[in-house]
Amino acid sequence: MEIIEENQRGINIYKLNGHLDSNTSLGFENKLIQAIDDGSKSMIIDFKNLDYISSAGLRVILKATKALKREDGKIMLCDMQDYVKEVFEISGFDSLLPIVGSMGDALDAFSPNRGPYGK
């Protein structure tokens, strides 16, 4: 899996390409937890080019979400392909995690008084 990292407006953005599974989840988990440990409180994970996610991948997303919440941070998930979105729906994670349709919607959610998950 390829991970493209960006930072916009102080928000760490992770664009995933390929498969997030048992072979790739540990590296991604370490990257997210390290960013949180380094003080990041705002993250977006872009699933636009992610072709596959396993239960190991779901666990990484949930673990990062919980770690951010402990630090009063926020994570947004965006731009999921139908298959990936279906995995989140079947697992029930879609009701636990903030998922929006586009990167623009995810960025807007971090603006004061904007977006469905804005503070």
Question: Predicted segment positions?
Answer:
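A charged, well-structured terminal subsegment
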Residues: S102-K119
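A short, terminal or domain-edge coil/loop segment
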Residues: M1, S95-L107
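General small-molecule cofactor/ligand-binding pocket signal
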Residues: I4, C78, V100
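Conserved catalytic submotifs in the C-terminal HATPase_c
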Residues: Q8-R9, K48, G104
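Short beta-strand/loop segment at the start of cytosolic alpha/beta domains
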Residues: M1-K15
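Amphipathic alpha-helical interaction surfaces in cytosolic regulatory modules
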Residues: L20-L97
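Active-site donor-binding loop signature of nucleotide-sugar glycosyltransferases
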Residues: L16-G18, S102
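Flexible, glycine-rich phosphate/dinucleotide-binding loops
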Residues: N12, V84, A106
